[in-house]
Regions:
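Extreme N-terminal signal-anchor transmembrane helix of membrane signaling/transducer proteins, especially
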Residues: 3, 7-42, 46, 50, ...
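Cytoplasm-proximal transmembrane signaling helix
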Residues: 18, 22, 397-402, 407-458, ...
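Membrane-interface helix-start motif
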Residues: 42-44, 286-295, 388, 405-425
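Intrinsic low-complexity, intrinsically disordered coil/linker regions enriched in small/polar
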Residues: 96-113, 208-219, 223-243, 285-391, ...
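Extracytoplasmic/periplasmic ligand-binding sensor regions of membrane-associated signaling proteins
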Residues: 146-281
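Short, charged helix-helix connector/hinge segments
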Residues: 449-469, 476, 515-517, 523-524
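Amphipathic coiled-coil signaling helices used for dimeric signal transmission
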Residues: 456, 469, 473-498, 504
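Catalytic NTP-binding/metal-coordinating core of nucleotidyl cyclase/transferase enzymes
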Residues: 501-503, 521-543
Length: 543
């Protein structure tokens, strides 16, 4: 016989009953808990996915509306007479500056400005390379040198340059700036843009609100000829529609020092386009919308959720929530997830993840193929997240929008339920143990009484009658036991009476001494008595 069944057979009924009750209760709680856990997890997952989908859809609508509003505003600006008059005045003033005198000391100051801001850095130890870079950026034409020495060097901060209307040099360009600078300054303020440019038909940047190092340069032949702005300029100039607004995705733009996207629209009457107006896409304003102005929890994204915008190059077009909240934690997490250290350091150096942080995830890959859906996968921070994704195609841009939240946070109620279930199970087991112990004692009590009664009968005491305390099988068994005990008692009494009768009969046939010898096993008995002599006696049927 196997050892386990043998051991189990030696366990008392009370212990077996206790084990059965305990096992039944634990299995019941486990089954109910497992069903509740799975059902709760599925319901919660669907609820979170639905929430993420709603947020993603709302953000997509926000982006599409923002781009529509921007393109509509661009058409209004460029079709208005102010833009036409302004580009004509700035172009004329720009051409007039070709022969303007730029003192050598001002030219040297401009060179030093470029060297100080665009020359050697800590990461660039090659001075020759730094000097070559500065030389490539330095103004080539006299108009550019004049404007930058008069405006770019005249203010210490970009904000001061924007506010500078007239330095008092008496030039036609400064007169145009004094007249129109306020108009374009209000444009960038209303649109939350960093800069607005006017570029004539030849590609000269004849005006800039920010008056940075792109002021006066030629966008087709100068140092920024390979920029996204140059591409947008060419497309806008070749457009047959004055209502055309060309949008170019984010790309590095050295004059601003940050990734910049452009909206460009032609200026001038049909058939006589004078140039274009270029507006830097208001990235800060878009990011405020994408980051809910820092109130992610109020938007329903908890402590770890966010929405991110990704381009076809798999680089971010928005700011990372973790980067904004804790740059050190951002660096640690993304590097651990596979982002190169130098990329994470570059994001921290620039103070932005736009066009720096790669997001090569399953959700982004599927959305770039035109799919919309939800899934659970790792994000760019290496965390398991629930993600809702979709493509966002607006104004000619091919972006991907992802709303996500960490699995740990999303399923926190399930984890709480699991902990509660475990604690409840432990409590139930304890209660069941106590209840089972009491029930087992009640259950085996009739068996104990029967056992004691059987021992009495075995000891020869047939005068046993057990109390019948129930009407169940134990009651029936007790009644049967009592009946058996009564029968045995009757048999014993009858047997005793029969023995007494036999004894009297034998005494009537023989003397008592002879009877005793016969009972002791003697068969041939001869003995002399005064009253009678027994010669032979053969008694059959008597014990």
């Amino acid at each position: 016989m196997p050892e386990t069944p043998r051991r189990f057979s030696r366990i008392s009924i009370q212990s077996k009953l206790l084990l059965m009750l305990l096992l039944t209760s634990v299995l019941s709680v486990a089954v109910v808990g497992a069903i509740g856990f799975q059902s709760g997890r599925e319901s919660l997952r669907e609820s979170v996915f639905e929430q993420l989908t709603l947020i993603r859809s709302a953000q997509a609508r926000m982006l599409e509306k923002a781009m529509r509003d921007l393109t509509s505003s661009m058409v209004v600006y460029t079709r208005g007479s102010t833009a036409e008059q302004a580009i004509a005045a700035f172009t004329a003033g720009y051409d007039e500056l070709r022969d303007a005198e730029v003192p050598p000391e001002r030219q040297q100051a401009l060179v030093e400005f470029y060297q100080r801001n665009y020359g050697e850095t800590d990461a660039d130890a090659d001075r020759d390379a730094a000097q070559a870079r500065v030389q490539a950026l330095l103004p080539r034409g006299n108009s550019q040198r004049y404007l930058q020495t008069t405006y770019t060097l005249a203010a210490d901060t970009p904000e001061d340059r924007i506010e500078l209307d007239d330095p008092g040099d008496g030039s036609a360009w400064s007169a145009a700036n004094a007249q129109y600078n306020e108009f374009f300054r209000q444009v960038i303020k209303r649109q939350h843009s960093a800069d607005a440019l006017l570029i004539d038909a030849r590609g000269n940047v004849v005006y800039s609100v920010g008056k940075g190092i792109d002021l006066g340069t030629n966008i087709q032949y100068g140092p920024y000829r390979g920029s996204n702005l140059a591409e947008a300029f060419k497309e806008a100039m070749n457009s047959n529609s004055l209502d055309e607004v060309v949008v170019r995705d984010f790309d590095t733009y050295q004059p601003s020092g940050i990734p910049t996207a452009w909206m460009v629209s032609p200026i001038g009457p049909a058939g006589n386009v004078q140039g274009v107006m270029a507006l830097a896409l208001p990235v800060d304003n878009l990011n405020r919308g994408l980051t809910f102005n820092g109130d992610w929890q109020g938007a329903g994204l908890g402590k770890t959720g966010e929405t991110i915008l990704v381009g076809p190059d798999l680089l971010m077009r928005s700011e990372s929530r973790l980067f904004l909240e804790d740059p050190d934690a951002y660096r640690s997490d993304v590097v651990a997830a596979g982002t190169p250290v130098e990329v994470a350091d570059e994001a921290i150096r620039q103070g932005s993840t736009i066009l720096v942080q790669p997001v090569d995830t399953d959700a982004v890959g599927q959305a770039l193929q035109g799919a919309t859906g939800t899934l659970i996968t790792e994000d760019y921070e290496g965390r398991r997240t629930l993600q809702a994704y979709s493509p966002v195609q607006t104004a000619g841009l091919n972006w991907v929008l992802v709303a996500k939240i960490d699995v740990a946070e999303a399923f926190a109620p399930v984890a709480t339920f699991t902990r509660t279930l475990v604690l409840s199970t432990v409590a139930i087991v304890l209660v069941v143990c106590i209840a089972a112990l009491l029930l087992a004692r009640v259950f085996v009590r009739p068996i104990r009484r029967l056992e004691a009664g059987a021992e009495q009968i075995g000891a020869g005491d047939f005068d046993v009658e057990l109390p019948v305390t129930s009407r169940d099988e134990f009651g029936d068994l007790t009644r049967a036991f009592n009946q058996m005990s009564s029968n045995l008692q009757t048999k014993e009494r009858q047997l005793t009476e029969q023995r007494a009768e036999n004894h009297r009969l034998l005494l009537s046939l023989m003397p008592e001494p002879v009877l005793e010898r016969y009972r002791d096993g003697e068969e041939n008995i001869a003995e002399e008595h005064q009253d009678v002599t027994v010669l032979f006696a053969n008694v059959d049927g008597l014990d």
